[in-house]
Amino acid sequence: MAKLSSLLNPIISKILEIYVYSWYSGISKDALFPSQCEQVGGSIVHELEKRLSRQDAMDLLFYEIPFLLIKHIENTEEAKLRFALPQGQILEIDTIYHSLHPHIALEKEENELVYCRLLVEDILKYLLPATNSKSEIECVILREALAVQIHKSIQVASSPETMYKFIIYLSKAILQPSRRPWKESITTAVRWVWHAFRILLITRGVPYFSTAWFQFYLKLFSQKDNVSSSDLTRWFFFYTLLYPWIALVSAFVAETMTLCCIVTIFYDKNVNRQWKQYILTSVSNMDKGNPSGGSQSTNVTTFRRFSQSSYPRRSNYRRRISTSSKSLYELSPSKFKSIPITSNPPPMLNLSKGSTSVEPTFCETNASVALSTVTSTPVFSTDSSPLSSRTRENLLSLIPSAVSSPTKANTNKSHQRSFSIPKATKDSQTPSENSAATLKQAAIDAYSQIPVIPFFLPSDKLIMLVESEYRNKHIFYSLLNSFTMVMFPELRHTK
């Protein structure tokens, strides 16, 4: 799990630099504050590592994730099939998809940030040390910084342009000839397979075999939509006699292949460095729209350099004493109390339009918020996955009744505005739409050059799975919820 720290610590530091140091450097030059922030971020990563070692992450990897991906493919194909019917032409594919598998975070656009806030707020109660979790100011700052970054990351990752770029990058990586000698490449591949096999041996993956990844790959590469009556006998013979053995071997291959990808990210130095650089670059690019980021970049750099120059000289014992004895709120309460909260009044939501009852008071360029708007009752973010069906009503309680239980009279009207699907395209395309179409065609061309794989997974099916921003958001929020429920089982039993 030490590999996880090397991946997450730079990301946490970058988030703190953007959402905390950018505004704090303008009101104070306290060198102890950023040191405490770095310690809190390190404690969060350390606690997350301990939970990953204690909890059964194999359930998440070999059941929850492939289950959600299978449901995503099935619902997408079902929505496309219903859209092809004459009575389905009046609805969009995303609307049909939403009716098949609704997600509470996508009922309204305002719900997405509220969903991330509630999720991070409940997680921080178990990740922060006891002394730090008592500070309301500290919890609010960390909640807003992490929630906004998660929200922005999902917004960027779910866009079709990002998916097309990922397809192009992956296609070029597969087609690019290896610079290593073939013997070294084979040795490296065998080493990654051995790492993956060793992980399977020390977990429940072997005695409790999961065929979920095999079912996912079978669903992904399957091109036959239905089976004719003449093939029923053949399929019955196949599924009763041959399928269990094929599924057993294929499940082992699928699990090993999936773990090889994860092991490569953690153990391959080049891939690890490229992955961290990509994440940090993405986080920096998300903050380019910050109007105050450019004017404060120099102050933030100087502030961090000044604070970190004296911080490494302190021993680990002193750091633990400092963390356990003082929280961020106790360090400089006068600084926080002097922040003019009413200088930028929060925007009021129009409840008549079915928006959420929690006011989004966080300004993306400033991490200081009004403490009166902090949710005092823990409410857990859920979707309709098997792990979280019991707690959906908790988050629904934050949504007005017009959204949570629409009447039959305004069902069609509410579905047009009740969840954040992209707007209908117009006849005249904008330059961004033209660039998206060009990028889409480039992704299709690059993918078509890959050997063998396009034969089993046609490009039109691949594009259908990634072309919708709403459906991409749906799968990301569902994966986030499943990760939370598996790593934090305490949330299932909280009322």
Swiss-Prot record:
Topology in membrane: Multi-pass membrane protein
Entry superkingdom: Eukaryota
Stretch list, region Disordered: 402-436
Alphabetically ordered keywords of this record: Endosome, Membrane, Protein transport, Transmembrane, Transmembrane helix, Transport
Localisation: Endosome membrane
Keyword Aminoacyl-tRNA synthetase: no
Alphabetical list of InterPro entries matching this protein: Phox_assoc
One Pfam family this sequence matches: PXA
Functional summary from the UniProt entry: Required for required for normal vacuolar morphology and for vacuolar protein transport. Also required for endosome-to-Golgi protein transport.
Gene Ontology terms describing biological process: late endosome to vacuole transport via multivesicular body sorting pathway; protein transport; retrograde transport, endosome to Golgi; vacuole organization
Ranges of compositional bias, category Polar residues: 402-419, 427-436
Name by which UniProt lists this protein: PXA domain protein 1
One GO cellular component, as annotated: endosome membrane
Primary gene name: pxa1
Organism: Schizosaccharomyces pombe (strain 972 / ATCC 24843)
Transmembrane portions of the chain: 7-27, 235-255, 446-466
Keyword Protease included in the entry's annotation: no
SMART domains on file: PXA (SM00313)
Record-annotated PXA domain positions: 1-174
